[in-house]
């Protein structure tokens, strides 16, 4: 394939490992994965945890909500939100090769009335007033091809993210890397959302830590979270009961 990308954007490749297809950005690091025999299934634990916002809304309300992904990856979250949850879904991706790969190799549907993929700089696009207050579930996974640190990771960026959310909206962020960089990222998120709004998971075995931030801090009773988890598991096949056990507020 001949690239027409600017020099700063990495080349996109994929590799197959049995029934699992991986997306790479000019490196060995995996940027996303798909089961070729079950393309809507969420393969990695951290990707599943990016759906933990489901614990904080009534399951019956999910199809009428709006999900947004900053960073397309292998389109796992975008496909799941659109096809499985039946949500209006918007994804913002900088690299046109990633979008082409997702459409060609990772079963991402074409845009339609409920699905829109924008080729844009996420940090700039989310400052557009048309998005403010419209997003119920914001999922942020913005890493460069070396997976060293988030590309956008300052307090102003997280404040812009919060401005996107509906009153009961949530943001989930994938943080990967050293404990020192994780701690800095959490403090920046807390500065934008408030410490009482932060719910961090423990790191997965692969080193990914998902942090959930609520637009408005709440403390749902554990019984309600468990009830919703049962519904999430039976309706959408996600390990939500495990989330309830390991997801704790930063400030009790």
Predicted regions located by residue number:
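C-terminal substrate-binding/active-site "lid" region of AdoMet-derived donor-dependent transferases
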Residues: 155-220
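SAM/dcSAM-binding transferase cores
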Residues: 1-18, 22, 30-37, 45, ...
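A generic structural signal for alpha->beta connector loops
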Residues: 86-88, 112-114, 168, 195-197, ...
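Generic secondary-structure boundary/loop-capping signal
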Residues: 31-33, 39, 105, 173
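A short, flexible beta-alpha/helix-coil linker loop
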Residues: 28-32, 143-146, 171
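Residues that form or immediately flank small-molecule/cofactor binding pockets and catalytic motifs
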Residues: 28, 122, 203-205
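The AdoMet/dcAdoMet-binding core of the Class I SAM-like
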Residues: 5, 17, 23, 38-167, ...
